[in-house]
Design a protein with these regions (language model features):
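Exposed aromatic-hydrophobic patches
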Residues: 61-62, 98-109
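Solvent-exposed serine/threonine-rich low-complexity stretches and specific carbohydrate-binding patches
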Residues: 85-98
């Protein structure tokens, strides 16, 4: 009887810990699944036309960029074969709506075939200054533009 009592006491102590562990594992799994569902591309209200991008030295021209609200067209570099969203090499201000023949100068220069990410950022505080200051581990003040789980952006090669 004494052994059964000890086992029951241990079970009562371990049961909530096991439940908590299962809950934490389920939450981590849901976060991983949610993060893996994020994609890049165009949306219904925000888009970047990447077909036919032209280049004049280090300046690129996009025929059409649509943004719902004022914001920025931003270019992030690839480094060691992967995009580096922690820095940017070009930005240009966009007004709400359709913007035609958008030019953006890449400060570091361009090499034909070089990969980069072109994406939209919202001018959150409407000051016409790209506030590329991290507010947490992943997001800058002028946040990336999303439609649902689609981040409005593209990985493209320099022409």
């Amino acid at each position: 009887m004494a052994i059964e009592g000890i086992i029951m006491n241990q079970y009562r102590v371990l049961k909530p810990l096991i439940a908590l562990l299962l809950l934490v594992c389920a939450h981590a799994s849901a976060q991983t699944q949610q993060a893996s569902q994020i994609s890049i591309g165009n949306g219904e209200n925000n888009w970047i036309t990447v077909e036919g991008v032209t280049r004049n030295q280090s300046t690129l021209t996009f025929s059409e960029v649509q943004i719902d609200g004022n914001g920025w067209l931003v270019i992030h570099p690839f480094e060691d074969g992967a995009p580096n969203g922690d820095k940017y090499v070009a930005s240009t201000y966009l007004e709400d709506g359709k913007n035609l023949d958008v030019t953006i100068k890449v400060h570091k220069g361009l090499v034909s075939g070089e990969m980069f990410i072109v994406m939209l950022h919202r001018d959150v505080n409407e000051n016409k200054v790209l506030d590329f200051v991290f507010v947490d581990e992943q997001n800058v003040m002028d946040t990336a533009v999303f439609e649902g789980s689609t981040m409005i952006g593209h990985a493209i090669a320099a022409p």
